[in-house]
Design a protein with these regions (language model features):
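FAD-binding subdomain of flavoenzyme oxidoreductases
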Residues: 117-162
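Short loop/turn segments at beta-alpha junctions that line or gate ligand-sensing/allosteric surfaces
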Residues: 111
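Active-site-proximal helix-loop elements at catalytic-domain edges
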Residues: 1-26, 80-82, 131-144
Length: 162
């Protein structure tokens, strides 16, 4: 699908790496799942705050995930929050802090997306004691172009693991 495709220049957070390409800003899952043979390989992009140029590259179509920014569920008693990839840490902190909760790993920039934190396995100020962001992820749902929708977990599962 050509919906929401625009030419764009992507730059790493520190400005050291840049590339020109196509950005797709889907606002519906069907724009992600739909096969589109004229598209180059696609890569998901969060807030774009990584120092590594992990969310763009020559010849790829970047899918900006920031429109997938819903908090789908929150159970303060179980200390579980379910979110879409484009939710920012600031949004998570705002919801969790109302219940006196927070994340053990808290990177310093609130505009970072949860999907970006998982992809980069970010850490806070004390990764030796608190671990990294992925250590707080129970499971995630991922769309793979050849295998479809996968539910991934750090514990053994039939699909694969994170």
């Amino acid at each position: 699908m050509n919906a929401h495709r625009v030419p764009a220049t992507f730059v790493s957070f520190d400005g050291a790496v840049s590339a020109s390409g196509v950005c797709q800003r889907p606002d519906r899952y069907r724009f992600i799942d739909a096969p589109d043979p004229d598209l180059a390989p696609r890569i998901a992009r969060g807030g774009g705050y990584s120092y590594a140029a992990a969310s763009f590259g020559a010849g790829s179509v970047v899918q900006d995930m920031r429109r997938f920014n819903r908090i789908l569920g929150f159970d303060p008693a179980a200390r579980i929050i379910e979110v879409e990839a484009g939710v920012t840490l600031g949004d998570v902190f705002a919801v969790a802090s109302r219940e006196g909760l927070g994340l053990p790993v808290q990177p310093g920039y609130p505009a970072i997306t949860v999907g970006g934190c998982i992809a980069a396995n970010v850490h806070g100020k004390n990764p030796v004691r608190e671990g990294t962001f992925v250590d707080s992820v129970l499971d995630l749902t991922l769309f793979h172009p050849d295998r479809g929708v996968l539910r991934l977990s750090p514990t053994p599962c039939p699909d694969c693991s994170i």
